[in-house]
Each structure stands twice: as C-alpha cells, then as structure tokens.
Swiss-Prot record:
InterPro entries reported in the protein's UniProt record: DiHydbiliverdin_OxRdtase, Ferredoxin-dep_bilin_Rdtase
EC numbers on record: 1.3.7.2
Gene coding for it: pebA
Lineage: Bacteria, Bacillati, Cyanobacteriota, Cyanophyceae, Synechococcales
Family label: Belongs to the HY2 family.
Function: Catalyzes the two-electron reduction of biliverdin IX-alpha at the C15 methine bridge.
Protein name: 15,16-dihydrobiliverdin:ferredoxin oxidoreductase
Coiled coil location: none
Catalytic activity: 15,16-dihydrobiliverdin + oxidized 2[4Fe-4S]-[ferredoxin] = biliverdin IXalpha + reduced 2[4Fe-4S]-[ferredoxin] + 2 H(+)
NCBIfam families (UniProt xref): PRK13246.1
Keywords: Oxidoreductase
Gene Ontology biological process terms, A to Z: phytochromobilin biosynthetic process
C-alpha cells in the first residue's frame, strides 16, 4: 500500500533532474525484532530542493504509513511540503494531513504560497476536516488551508491518489512559476528551516509510533540523523 505514491514522487523528482542520495543501511530498510513492521526510506536532492525524503512503514494489516517532506533550497522562501498518510487496517480508518508548511505566519506570505490548497479542499470535501484542527499548532508551521482527512476505505480507494497528485503538482507549479522572494532573505530562510526541524524534532507525533515498533535508541537516531537533520544546528 502507498507504493503508488512513492512511485509518483520518484517520477516527479526525476523530472526535476533530481538524484537519489546514499543513506545508511540502518535507515534504508529496518525491521523490528519479529519483522512485523518494516520501514523503508529514500532521500533525494534536486536543483530546486536541497532535501526531499520519503518514508514507508509496512505494518501489514495493522498499519500502513506514508510520509514525505520536501525542503526547498535556502535561496527560496517557498513553504516546506509535508504529508503524513496513515491507514489503520483493523479499524478501516484513514488519516491524512497534507500542507505547504509556511516558514512564517505573515498573511501575505500565506496567501501567496498556501492559499491554493483551498481549491483541493473544496473539490474533495472529505479532506476538509476542520474538526481536527486541534491536532496541530496553527501558529507554527501549518497553513490555514492544511488538508486533513479522517476517512474510510472509500476515501482511501477513490480519493487519496487524486488528492495527493493535485497536492504535489500544485506545489511543483509554485516553484516552476519562479516566485521572487518578497518576505525573507537567504539567512532568514535558513534560520526558519532550522527552526522547523527543531520544532518538528520536539513535536512530531511519529516519535511515539516509531518507538513502539523499533525501540527508543533506533528511533532517536532516525529522527536526528534522517528526518530532522537541522535539529542540531546552532542559530546564532
């Protein structure tokens, strides 16, 4: 499950003249003790994106997880793309959170870079769940148009691929339009990406999930060395 999303991203990254980066074997594929849970990771870079990572967790019928985060280069003030998609097989429940995660919360910045998400939410009403907005901090790295779905198998089978494709294509089109930085300079962009990683290192809900499957030692290393690598950077 979710392999089609991985393939879709790989195709798009390839079209951006992106290339896969080498990562350590312990992150490339990792099994828990009885191999009931298997996690696979990919890391890419392209001329426009300094880091684009993909994570797939296969927990059989219990749980399936897909995550991707794209960091633009430090010379671009574009938001960070973030997507978390979870399928709980036993309960037949889908949870999806997709957003263009803003570097700042200034209204004009949000309107310029994030408001187009509203068109996707309008087209797919199941992915416009305002009741779940308490699961994230709207004053930090989330936009007012964050896409949230707490759905079922129908949403998984019928809607998810279309929503994800629209989400990715729209984001890539933002970059292709070559927007001029209006709000942040290079140093401010780098600082805000560092702050994003530090915030995510502390707040990412996947921490508990990974610890329960793979243990605390591996999870801490994984989050620090693969997911949020700018967490250890010092802001002067």
């Amino acid at each position: 499950m979710f392999d089609s999303l991985v393939d879709f991203l790989k195709t798009n990254i390839d079209e951006l003249n992106g290339h896969e980066l080498q990562i350590s074997n312990e992150f490339k594929e990792h099994h828990n003790k009885d191999s009931k849970y298997i996690i696979k990771n990919w890391l890419f870079s392209s001329p426009e994106y300094r880091k684009w990572r993909i994570t797939r967790l296969d927990g059989g019928k219990n749980i399936q997880v897909f995550n991707t985060v794209a960091y633009p280069n430090f010379d671009s003030e574009l938001p960070i793309l973030g997507a978390d998609i979870l399928w709980f097989g036993t309960a037949k429940k889908l949870l999806a959170i997709l957003d263009y995660q803003p570097l700042i919360q200034e209204n004009k910045y949000l309107e310029k870079y994030c408001s187009s998400l509203g068109m996707i939410k309008k087209k797919y009403s199941a992915f416009d769940n305002n009741k779940m907005k308490n699961i994230y901090d709207s004053k930090k790295y989330f936009s007012p148009w964050v896409i949230i779905c707490r759905g079922n198998k129908l949403n998984l089978d019928r809607d998810l691929n279309d929503v994800f494709h629209a989400f990715i294509n729209n984001y890539l089109n933002l970059n292709k339009s070559n927007p001029v930085n209006q709000f942040l300079n290079l140093e401010e962009i780098k600082i805000n990406q560092i702050k994003y990683d530090k915030y995510s290192f502390e707040k990412d809900p996947a921490d508990k999930l990974f610890k329960s499957f793979f243990g605390e030692k591996w999870t801490k290393k994984f989050i620090n060395k693969f997911l949020f690598t700018l967490n250890n950077e010092i802001i002067l």
